[in-house]
Amino acid sequence: MSSSLYRVLRNAWEVGPRSYWKQLNSIGDTKSGRLVGTDIYGNKFYETDHQDEIHLRTRYVEYKEKDYDMSQVEPGWHFWLGYGVDTAPCNTPKEKLPIRAYPYKFQPNYTGTPGAFVTYNTLKPKISAWEPVTKQRS
C-alpha cells in the first residue's frame, strides 16, 4: 500500500476537509501540491514535491466535472501529466508551442452521450426482435 498514516493526515491538513473528501471520492487517495495551471475546460493541474510520493505519481489533475473522462484534458496537459515535458503548457513560451499538423479544435470524447457519432444504416436489419405469439387456450 502506498499510503502511510502520516502522509494521509499531512495531505488532509494541507488541502482542507472539502478537497480531502472530494479527492477520496474521485481518485481514492489524498494528494497535496502546488497549482501549476488550469486548462480551458476548468480542470486544475497540480504537482507535488513530497519525497514520500510514488515515483511518477507526483502530477495529478482535479477535474471540473463530477463525471469526468480523460479525453476532457487538452493534449498539451495530457503530455505534461505523462512526464513527456517538464514545463507545463501554461509556462511554455509561444515560440516553443508545437504546431499541429491538423489544426482542428480539440473535442472531448462523446461516447455514451447524446452527442456520440452514430452511423446511418440503409441496409435491412439482419436480426429482428422476437415477438411471442400466444395461442388461445380451449
Swiss-Prot record:
Pfam families: NDUFA12. It comes from the Eukaryota. Transmembrane segments: none annotated. It is a peripheral membrane protein. InterPro entries: NDUFA12 (IPR007763). The keyword Mitochondrion applies. Keywords: Electron transport, Membrane, Mitochondrion, Mitochondrion inner membrane, Respiratory chain, Transport. Belongs to the complex I NDUFA12 subunit family. PANTHER family: NADH DEHYDROGENASE [UBIQUINONE] 1 ALPHA SUBCOMPLEX SUBUNIT 12 (PTHR12910:SF2), NADH-UBIQUINONE OXIDOREDUCTASE SUBUNIT B17.2 (PTHR12910). Complex I is composed of 42 different subunits. This is NADH dehydrogenase [ubiquinone] 1 alpha subcomplex subunit N7BM. It comes from Yarrowia lipolytica (strain CLIB 122 / E 150) (Yeast).
